[in-house]
């Protein structure tokens, strides 16, 4: 369980987050959906302990979150792999147990990168590097995976492929995944829950995706949901709502 209570944050005189409250159940994929500059990435960094809020608290399994730690793993739009280390060694970074190249290769198979362990990041495409990031998340088994526009810089084919692999990653782990995006289709396909945000990170609305629809991109229910979200997105109401439990 992640409990976010009365988070406010400002940079100088500019308040980025007004008063954010949310409870997130363990093992869900939750998406913060909103336009650029609404504060969603700032909120993600606060949840991960990478940024101290002006006020308010974040608790993960009742433990106050104030600093980065191995229980939270961040995946960015642009990879943060170390260029002088091969893929196996990048995956091992920060791991609290020994893991052989063969064991890592078994994980790399899940993201179609088997036998790439001795390769260096510069030899991989952007999509491959993001697949390494997903593999690292699977190996490290954090409690929370935070993803800030992880697929935004990729072409459509690679993006769809990685979306499918992200869904598989979530099925094979107990991690809670929080995704930041401004892409409505990506949010609908990946999420158990969508939090639609306006300026100041104010919650406009929230949606639960019915699992019976199995993330079928052409499902009529999901198409109706998409139209509903697009309408709310366009209206961009900024009124804060009470704390949600999801």
Where does each model-flagged region fall?
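Conserved ABC transporter NBD signature motif
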Residues: 56-68
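The feature captures the beta-strand-to-loop junction immediately N-terminal to the Walker
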Residues: 33-35
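Helix-to-loop junction immediately C-terminal to a conserved catalytic motif
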Residues: 48
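Conserved signature/switch motifs of ABC ATPase nucleotide-binding domains
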Residues: 122, 140
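Hydrophobic anchor residue at the start of the ABC signature
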Residues: 134
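Conserved ABC ATPase "signature" region
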Residues: 99-116, 167-168
